[in-house]
Structures are given as structure tokens and as C-alpha cells.
């Protein structure tokens, strides 16, 4: 029997059916202390979850569900390196990557020497490249580094480096991920072979998307370099769990950075996959990123469930999804530097929890992962906020914003800095206003304007739940805390739903069939198993 038949689940269902499922947020906000009672803070991260259809009774019932599912035990199992990835019989030790040798035990402690060894090699390579001592075939220093990867080998480093774009760096960073070659072709036209270095990042070192782009990059280098040994020794670095495959492709051991099978791709930015981050902000900055994540890890491992930020955020989403029937979630950062955060979280959340089979092997009869999407908030206001405010879909939202900006002098009164300060305040005002209108609907309309909204086409139902997450500023530390918070939130949800968040079998079949389809496109006989649609599409391509 699954969690849906348990006493804690049934109690929540009864709670929803008895009125909480239909109560309007405007009624809950008649309590003037509500915001204080439904917010949590850890260091530079503040979470306001008051704009959810919950009461103290709801929270208590959710905590009882977590305790019934043995959440404290499962947190301990994750943090100490037990095999929580049961379908692949592995631990998920991404938290060990950012422990920096402290506050760990069990399997997480055992792997610390290996982790530190890789960090030291990363530091040496980072210093060599950033200082201009890593040189290309002509003797000129490397000026441009291109990360070739996809999924976890791309999204994490891309998101973090874009978020920290205001930090100056001696290296120009670029990212290639798409298999179609357009990114590669467009980028290479603007680079010079003699000053370009490629990072080839792939956990398995068999990912066709990555290897096809790498082959194109190698062919581009061959236009100027006749000696392949020079290409691989001076213009390629490999990051993988497979040193033999890296060497087979041509990358020498001294240019290899290792990580391990117990690091999931979507949890790998803390490993050598984060090498581009170190190139952008230096190893001190990279360790600050790890430290921020570790601070959230310690909070997650030790805080009481009711005061535990990832736990509370996860349980609220469980409430919204399974008891209020809300199956969409929007991530809305109010700073353009966080542009890639929604895409990063799409992979983290949906590849982890987009499952319909429990750990037992049985199909689950309840909803699991929501469809997650998002955009930079100010841009989204002019795109899909119409749906959020007046559509037929119920949508949960996470509003995310920095309280302060660090890309101008806060004490300066130059016209430029005053303008930037004004823009930042406008962004925050829009962030807070949008969450308020989503919550209150028509009740947010000022009394002196109500007459002008007296039309069915100007009706705002409100009652859309949201969280507002404020970080002090966008820094390596706060990004580490923010990403770790979402990682742990995702894990908590998987524990409640009794699914494994650390495998991704759903992506394998498509890759397998793509190989068969590629052979057909290359003018080989069509497989009898092809359907008429696929046959017709191939025919249109190969004619």
C-alpha cells in the first residue's frame, strides 16, 4: 500500500475537503501577524511562504506526513552516503563535494581525500589559465574557453557564471550544448584557434551531443594545427568519470579532471564540472559557492522540520499538488542575471521527480512532479502573467530577488548609479506587487480605482499561491545556498512520494531510438519497426 492510503495522507485530504481547499488567501491575511508566522531565514536567504493556502493546522499535518515517511532518517541516509539511489545501487554524495572536509560522516567522510585532490588540481589549472601561463599552439595565452557539454554538464556552470557576470575575469567563457551545430558554427566564427581552449565535459564521455560538438571543434583546430598531440595537450581539457574514454579520445591524463559515478549530472556543478565557474570567479570564489551550499546542507541536516527551509517548501508543494490539485510551477527571478535559473531548475526538478513508478516498482496513483517553467519576472509580466492572473490554470510561483545590488556603488550619487538604484527598486516593487495581486486578486484594487475595474474582463480572482525568496545579493555564497535549497526540497518531495530522484531512465529510450533513426537518415534501409509518420519524415529529409 502506498502513501496515499496512510493515515497522515488521509488526514490532509480531509483537511482540504473540509474547507482549506477552497479558502481564499485574502481571508487568511486578515491575520496581521501572518507574514511573521510563515517565514524563515538562514543567513543571507529569507523565505516568505505566507502567500500559500495553509494554516498552522496544515503545517502540522504536513509535518506528521513527513515524520510518517521517516524523513529525518532519509535525510541522514542522504547526508552520510547511504545508497539512496536504489535503482542504480549508489549513494548520492553531491553534499560531500561541498563539505570541504568538515561536518561529514560515513561515506561522505570517506570520499573527502579524493574530492580535495581534484580541487587542488582544479586550482592549479585555474591559476595557470587565468594568469596567462596556459598557452595555445602559437605561444599566445588562452583568452577564450569554450565549455562543451549538455544537461548537467552545461546548465549548472552556465547558470552560475551568468549569474555572477559582474565579477571581472581575464577569461572569456562560452558554452556549447545543442546537438544541431548552430551554436558551434556561430561561436567559432568569432574565435581564434591560437587562443581558444575547449573543456569537454561529459559524465560518461559517450554523450553524442557533446562528442559531435567536440569533433567539430577538433576539426576547426586542425585548420591551423597539423599535430594532433598539440591540439589535445594545449587546446582540450576533459571532465568525466571515465579517464580511459578521455584518453582514448585523445585527452592526456594531465589535462583530465575527474568526478565520480555517485555524482548525478544535475547535481554536478559542485564537482569538476564546475571548472568553468572557477575560471570565471577563481578558486576562492568557487570555494565560497561550495561553502554557501554547505551552510544550507547543515541547516537541512540539523534544523527542526518546522524550521527547515527546504522541508517546509517541499511540504507546501506537496500540499498544493496533491491536495489542492495545482500541477504547474513558475520560477520568476527578478534580476536578469538569474536568467538561466528557471532552465536549471527545470532539469533539477523534472528530471529528478518526473517519475510515475515508486521505489517498490509499483505505479503511483497520485500526482508527482509539477510542470516547472519560468522566465525573468519583468519580462514574464509582458508574456505569460496574463495566464497567471486571469487564466484557467492554477499555478504555484516562486518569486526570487536580491535585496541589494553589487554592480554599482550604493553610496554614490552619480546619475548612473541613481538610475541603477531606481531600476532595482522598480524591479523589487514589481516583484512584491505581482505576488500581492496573485494572492488578493480584486481585493488588491485601491478603493478609489474600483469603479474603473467594474468589468468582467478586468476581474482578478487571485488565490494563486506563491513563495517569495529574498537573497541579500547575488554572490557565490547566496547562489550556493539557493541551489542547495532547491536540491534538498526536491529530495524531500521524492521521499514523500516514495520515488527515486537520482535516476533518469526516462531519457534513455529516446537516445537509443535516435541512433536507429540516424542510421535511416544516412540512407540505410528503414527499420520495419518505424511507424508511418517517422518513415514519412525521414523520406522528406533524405530525398
Swiss-Prot record:
Q: Which PROSITE patterns match?
A: P_GLUCOSE_ISOMERASE_1 (PS00765), P_GLUCOSE_ISOMERASE_2 (PS00174), P_GLUCOSE_ISOMERASE_3 (PS51463)
One GO cellular-component annotation of the UniProt record comes to: cytosol
UniProt-listed Enzyme Commission number(s): 5.3.1.9
Q: Name one Pfam family in it.
A: PGI
Entry keyword annotation includes Amino-acid biosynthesis: no
What does the record list as GO biological process? gluconeogenesis; glucose 6-phosphate metabolic process; glycolytic process
Instruction: Indicate where this protein resides in the cell.
Output: Cytoplasm
Record-linked SUPFAM superfamilies: SIS domain
State where it is primarily located.
Answer: cytoplasm
| Keyword Isomerase attached | yes
User: What keywords tag this UniProt record?
Assistant: Cytoplasm, Gluconeogenesis, Glycolysis, Isomerase
The active site consists of 351 (proton donor), 382, 511
Q: Which InterPro entries match?
A: G6P_Isomerase, G6P_Isomerase_C, Phosphoglucose_isomerase_CS, SIS_dom_sf, SIS_PGI_1, SIS_PGI_2
What is the main EC category here? Answer: isomerase
Task: Please give the catalytic activity noted in the UniProt record.
Answer: alpha-D-glucose 6-phosphate = beta-D-fructose 6-phosphate
Sample GO molecular function, one term = glucose-6-phosphate isomerase activity
What metabolic or biological pathway is this protein involved in? Carbohydrate biosynthesis; gluconeogenesis; Carbohydrate degradation; glycolysis; D-glyceraldehyde 3-phosphate and glycerone phosphate from D-glucose: step 2/4
Q: Which family does it belong to?
A: Belongs to the GPI family.
Q: What is the annotated role of this protein in its UniProt record?
A: Catalyzes the reversible isomerization of glucose-6-phosphate to fructose-6-phosphate.
Q: Which NCBIfam families match?
A: PRK00179.1
Protein name in UniProt: Glucose-6-phosphate isomerase
Amino acid at each position: 500500500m502506498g502513501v496515499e492510503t496512510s493515515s497522515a495522507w488521509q488526514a490532509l485530504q480531509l483537511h482540504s475537503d473540509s474547507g482549506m481547499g477552497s479558502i481564499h488567501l485574502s481571508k487568511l491575511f486578515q491575520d496581521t501577524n501572518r507574514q511573521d508566522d510563515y517565514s524563515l531565514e538562514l543567513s543571507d536567504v529569507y523565505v516568505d511562504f505566507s502567500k500559500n493556502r495553509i494554516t498552522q493546522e496544515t503545517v502540522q499535518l504536513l509535518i506528521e506526513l513527513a515524520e510518517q515517511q521517516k524523513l529525518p532518517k532519509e535525510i541522514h541516509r542522504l547526508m552520510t552516503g547511504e545508497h539512496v539511489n536504489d535503482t542504480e545501487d549508489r549513494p548520492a554524495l553531491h553534499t560531500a563535494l561541498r563539505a570541504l572536509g568538515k561536518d561529514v560522516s560515513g561515506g561522505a567522510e570517506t570520499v573527502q581525500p579524493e574530492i580535495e585532490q581534484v580541487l587542488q588540481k582544479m586550482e592549479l589549472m585555474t591559476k595557470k589559465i587565468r594568469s596567462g601561463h596556459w598557452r595555445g599552439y602559437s605561444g599566445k595565452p588562452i583568452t577564450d574557453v569554450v565549455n562543451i557539454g549538455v544537461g548537467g554538464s552545461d546548465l549548472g556552470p552556465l547558470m552560475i557564471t551568468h549569474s555572477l557576470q559582474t565579477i571581472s575575469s581575464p577569461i572569456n567563457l562560452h558554452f556549447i550544448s545543442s546537438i544541431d551545430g548552430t551554436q558551434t558554427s556561430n561561436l567559432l566564427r568569432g574565435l581564434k584557434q591560437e587562443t581558444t581552449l575547449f573543456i569537454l565535459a561529459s559524465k560518461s564521455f559517450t554523450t553524442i551531443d557533446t562528442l559531435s560538438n567536440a569533433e567539430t571543434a577538433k576539426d576547426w583546430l586542425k585548420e591551423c594545427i597539423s599535430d594532433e598531440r598539440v591540439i589535445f595537450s594545449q587546446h582540450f581539457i576533459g571532465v568525466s568519470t571515465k579517464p580511459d574514454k578521455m584518453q582514448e579520445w585523445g585527452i592526456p591524463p594531465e589535462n583530465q579532471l575527474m568526478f565520480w559515478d555517485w555524482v548525478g549530472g544535475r547535481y554536478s556543478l559542485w564537482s569538476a564540472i564546475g571548472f568553468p565557474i572557477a575560471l570565471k570567479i577563481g578558486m576562492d570564489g568557487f570555494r565560497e559557492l561550495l561553502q554557501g551550499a554547505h551552510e544550507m546542507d547543515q541547516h537541512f541536516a540539523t534544523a527542526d522540520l518546522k524550521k527547515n527551509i527546504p522541508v517546509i517548501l517541499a511540504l507546501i508543494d506537496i500540499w498544493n499538488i496533491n491536495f489542492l490539485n495545482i500541477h504547474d510551477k513558475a520560477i520568476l527571478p527578478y534580476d536578469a542575471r538569474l536568467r538561466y535559473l528557471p532552465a536549471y531548475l527545470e532539469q533539477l526538478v523534472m528530471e529528478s521527480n518526473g517519475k510515475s513508478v515508486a521505489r517498490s516498482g509499483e505505479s503511483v496513483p497520485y500526482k508527482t512532479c509539477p510542470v516547472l517553467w519560468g522566465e525573468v519576472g519583468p519580462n514574464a509580466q509582458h508574456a505569460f502573467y496574463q495566464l497567471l492572473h486571469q487564466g484557467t490554470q492554477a499555478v504555484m510561483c516562486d518569486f526570487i530577488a536580491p535585496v541589494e545590488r553589487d554592480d554599482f556603488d550604493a553610496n554614490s550619487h552619480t546619475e548612473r548609479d541613481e538610475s541603477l538604484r531606481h531600476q532595482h527598486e522598480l524591479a523589487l516593487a514589481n516583484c512584491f506587487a505581482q505576488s500581492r495581486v496573485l494572492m488578493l486578486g480584486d481585493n488588491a484594487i485601491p478603493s478609489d480605482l474600483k469603479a474603473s475595474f467594474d468589468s468582467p474582463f478586468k476581474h482578478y480572482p487571485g488565490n494563486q499561491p506563491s513563495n517569495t525568496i529574498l537573497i541579500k545579493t547575488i554572490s557565490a555564497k547566496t547562489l550556493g545556498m539557493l541551489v542547495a535549497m532547491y536540491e534538498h526540497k526536491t529530495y524531500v518531495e521524492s521521499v514523500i512520494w516514495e520515488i527515486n530522484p537520482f535516476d533518469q531512465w526516462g531519457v534513455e529510450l529516446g537516445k537509443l531510438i535516435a541512433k536507429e533513426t540516424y542510421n535511416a537518415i544516412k540512407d540505410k534501409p528503414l527499420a520495419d519497426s518505424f511507424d508511418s509518420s517517422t518513415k514519412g519524415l525521414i523520406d522528406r529529409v533524405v530525398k
